[in-house]
């Protein structure tokens, strides 16, 4: 999840992550926590961090539609393209319909 997901997906909100972490601790005998380190940063910031870690984004998947290649048109494909562009990272992803 990332900062932009909060209004769209209730399970990406900090309150949900905190509640799930509390439930995991209450329901186990272990010291279990759920961490969501990217909850309050942008997708572009996440992409920059990934680049620092050496992530090859052509080897990652975002598309909701599945298939052999990214569709290039669904919301996650568009967010991916925007985040990589904002982060200054060349997008080498193969898209069926490039934006």
Feature annotation, model-predicted:
Residues 1-99:
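Nucleotide-activated chemistry modules centered on ATP-dependent adenylation/adenylyltransferase
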């Amino acid at each position: 999840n990332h900062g932009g997901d909060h209004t769209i997906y209730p399970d990406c909100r900090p309150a949900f992550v905190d509640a799930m972490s509390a439930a995991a601790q209450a329901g186990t005998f272990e010291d279990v926590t759920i961490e969501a380190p990217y909850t309050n940063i942008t997708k572009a910031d996440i992409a920059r961090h990934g680049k620092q870690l050496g992530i090859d984004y052509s080897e990652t998947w975002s598309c909701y539609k599945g298939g052999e290649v990214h569709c290039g048109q669904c919301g996650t494909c568009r967010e991916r393209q925007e985040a990589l562009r904002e982060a200054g990272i060349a997008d080498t992803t193969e898209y069926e319909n490039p934006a």
